[in-house]
Amino acid sequence: MVSLELLSSLDGLLWLQSGAKVGALFQQHQTTVSRNQKKCAQVFGISLFKHKKKWSTNGDETLLQLERRVHQAARLQGKSRLRIEINGWFDSPHFNPPPSGWIVGSANNHGDPHGIQCFRQHIIDVCLCPLTNLPTESQDLTIIPLNTTIEFGFVVLQQHANQERISELIYTLKQI
């Protein structure tokens, strides 16, 4: 197992695609983010590389995926803040300020399935998507519309759809 700080640096870089964003979001200096992601990658026997302005991993991620599931379970139990990808909706009153108990981030890759990829890899816990641009339905995903004046909704893993902390977030956001 690795510390929350080490895994946050590695996963934050893969999620947000910017060391500066990771540092700001997880309150780490950018050099600390770099050092931590390297240590974390080394523990799992993988490497990070940048190709066409996108951070990716190289190597067998089996142990890393198991570790991510453990960390996500801890977040869902309230042991640390949950993560939500908001796809550039920072100006929305729903996310400024961030909901209590949540880390709000927006990757540099809005136009591709990056947020859903991070979501499926257990890097983030919820992904906000415009209802006009939702991922194709699959058996493991649930789409929860927010029914606000702006048409957007959350994509969550079906197994987490009724999880207490996620339900609380959705209830709170529907009140805004």
Model features per residue range: what roles?
Residues 151-165:
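A bilobed periplasmic-binding-protein/Venus flytrap-type ligand-binding module shared by bacterial periplasmic
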